[in-house]
């Protein structure tokens, strides 16, 4: 090796390990409109300064590795590296910090939620220097949003397809979720739709099991919804779950649903994966199918306050990947969901522009630049007594889904559907007349019971059923 080469090497590269904060902690950095911004809740190991922890997150989720490497000199780290540009201590929590990280847009493949998550939440969550790490929020810049198709159709197109306006939509998950034959399953679908519901639904784990193969279920459900449509004069739908073991099989099931002429299919977007979900969303737009997405497995990822990914991030990812509906919790039912947090990500699903609002857990202003909106689905442990609260909390652009709250009616499935439809109509009418659903809800339901024995029977069964448990994931004080 010549002396000149040795001299250049000694100047251009110095082997060894150096602190992340020397390269990746840049409090002077001014974020760009094209940056993807992330807010991480960081819990460092004892003895690790917060600046080093935040810089480590920025490094390990972008260009960094544990040691200096020769090939750093072959690219521009200043152009491609993530930067931890701000750190806040979490009030009321010991050794917890919010680290803000900016990522250059060139780090991400266009139109790929899969690639975005692989970078931002890939290896870094197993990093030993951190006791815990949670991704609280993302700011997706308009330049990146515009590379996604998003929901196949969106809220307004769905309403136009269904010809239903001015109220929430009503649904029901068929129970028991497993074990019914296809014919008995179709019977339950017919009874619920005939009783007044807009939708019925496959449960998330109904795919193609020995007791009910997918093709048989699709056929009996299509027969049921067409019969109910003929008798009621309303457009009906059943969420036919197309989730399968391979993308090819999933698309095959969606093709069969399209051939049957049904309006909507379903996908478990977290267990199925973002690549599969985006593929199905593209198929649904091209072929006029609505897409209902279920968030099965979400609580494994989002429920713990100090580690994982907050659901508001998963909701944003779903809007980008594509889905016309997404389960969002109920606030009042059996599943986790604090009111302000829930309404925060509901707005992120539906609205075109959402301002930063830390009181609702929204860390960044989000501009969706006309990406279609997603209907939030309130489902899980709800019944007729919850109808006023659900109508007040979620408003018209939502789906209120009663499984046990329909099929558990003492008189059967159809009366259960009648009870829910009448409770909803009573709440919408009362709201339109200027009544306060939050204060007068129970009285509104009692008044409606005078005109509906089905509703009165439902109210009697569920009058004392409540789920009074404190939420695990709550806002910081």
Curated annotation (Swiss-Prot):
Name the record gives this protein: Ribulose bisphosphate carboxylase large chain
Catalytic activity, EC: 4.1.1.39
Modified residues (N6-carboxylysine): 201
Gene that encodes the chain: rbcL
Binding site for substrate: 123, 173, 177, 295, 327, 379
GO cellular component: chloroplast
Site (described: Transition state stabilizer): 334
Localization (cell): Plastid, Chloroplast
Molecular function per GO: magnesium ion binding; monooxygenase activity; ribulose-bisphosphate carboxylase activity
Note: The basic functional RuBisCO is composed of a large chain homodimer in a 'head-to-tail' conformation. In form I RuBisCO this homodimer is arranged in a barrel-like tetramer with the small subunits forming a tetrameric 'cap' on each end of the 'barrel'.
Oligomeric and partner information: Heterohexadecamer of 8 large chains and 8 small chains; disulfide-linked. The disulfide link is formed within the large subunit homodimers.
Keyword Disulfide bond: yes
Main location: plastid
Propeptide, residue positions: 1-2
Transmembrane segments: none
NCBIfam families named among the record's database cross-references: PRK04208.1
Active site: 175, 294
Modified residues (N-acetylproline): 3
Residue(s) carrying N6,N6,N6-trimethyllysine: 14
Cofactor(s) in the UniProt record: Mg(2+)
Catalytic activity: 2 (2R)-3-phosphoglycerate + 2 H(+) = D-ribulose 1,5-bisphosphate + CO2 + H2O; D-ribulose 1,5-bisphosphate + O2 = 2-phosphoglycolate + (2R)-3-phosphoglycerate + 2 H(+)
Keywords of the record: Acetylation, Calvin cycle, Carbon dioxide fixation, Chloroplast, Disulfide bond, Lyase, Magnesium, Metal-binding, Methylation, Monooxygenase, Oxidoreductase, Photorespiration, Photosynthesis, Plastid
Recorded coiled-coil stretches: none
The keyword Lyase appears for this protein: yes
Binding of Mg(2+), residues: 201, 203-204
Gene3D superfamilies, per database record: Ribulose bisphosphate carboxylase, large subunit, C-terminal domain, RuBisCO large subunit, N-terminal domain
């Amino acid at each position: 090796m010549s002396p000149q080469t040795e001299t250049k090497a000694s100047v251009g590269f110095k082997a060894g390990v150096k602190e992340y904060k020397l390269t990746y902690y840049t409090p002077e950095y001014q974020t760009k409109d094209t940056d993807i911004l992330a807010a991480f809740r960081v819990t460092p190991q004892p003895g690790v300064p917060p600046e080093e922890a935040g810089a480590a997150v920025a490094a390990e989720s972008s260009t960094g590795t544990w040691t200096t490497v020769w090939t750093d000199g072959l690219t521009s780290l200043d152009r491609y590296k993530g930067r931890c540009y701000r750190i806040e201590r979490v009030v009321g929590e010991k050794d917890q910090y919010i680290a803000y990280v900016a990522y250059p847009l060139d780090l991400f493949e266009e139109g790929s939620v899969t690639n975005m998550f692989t970078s931002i939440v890939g290896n870094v969550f197993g990093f030993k220097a951190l006791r815990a790490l949670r991704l609280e929020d993302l700011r997706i810049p308009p330049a990146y949003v515009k590379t996604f198709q998003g929901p196949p159709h969106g809220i307004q197109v769905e309403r136009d397809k269904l010809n239903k306006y001015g109220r929430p939509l009503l649904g029901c998950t068929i129970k028991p979720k497993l074990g019914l034959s296809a014919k008995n399953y179709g019977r339950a679908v017919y009874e619920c739709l005939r009783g007044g519901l807009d939708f019925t639904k496959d449960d998330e784990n109904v795919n193609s099991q020995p007791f009910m193969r997918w093709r048989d279920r699709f056929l009996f459900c299509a027969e049921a919804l067409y019969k109910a449509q003929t008798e009621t004069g309303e457009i009906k739908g059943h969420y036919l779950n197309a989730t399968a073991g391979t993308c090819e099989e999933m698309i095959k099931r969606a093709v069969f649903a399209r051939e049957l002429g049904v309006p909507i299919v379903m996908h478990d977007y977290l267990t199925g994966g973002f690549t599969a979900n985006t593929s199905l969303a593209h198929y649904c737009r091209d072929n006029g199918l609505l897409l209902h997405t279920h968030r099965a497995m979400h609580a494994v990822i989002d429920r713990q306050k100090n580690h994982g990914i907050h659901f508001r991030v998963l909701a944003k990812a779903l809007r980008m990947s594509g889905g016309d509906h997404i389960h969002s919790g109920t606030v009042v039912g059996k599943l986790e969901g604090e009111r302000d947090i829930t309404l925060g990500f509901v707005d992120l699903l539906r609205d075109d522009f959402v301002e930063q609002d830390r009181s609702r857990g929204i860390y960044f202003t989000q501009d969706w630049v006309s990406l279609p909106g997603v209907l939030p689905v309130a489902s899980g442990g709800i019944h007729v007594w919850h109808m006023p609260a659900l109508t007040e909390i979620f408003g018209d652009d939502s789906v209120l889904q009663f499984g046990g709250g329909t099929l558990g009616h003492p008189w059967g499935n159809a009366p259960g559907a009648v009870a829910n439809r009448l409770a909803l109509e009573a709440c919408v009418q009362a709201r339109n007349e200027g009544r306060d659903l939050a204060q007068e809800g129970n009285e509104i339901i009692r008044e409606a019971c005078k005109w509906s024995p089905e509703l009165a029977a439902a109210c009697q069964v569920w009058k004392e059923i409540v789920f009074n448990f404190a939420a695990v994931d709550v806002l910081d004080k």
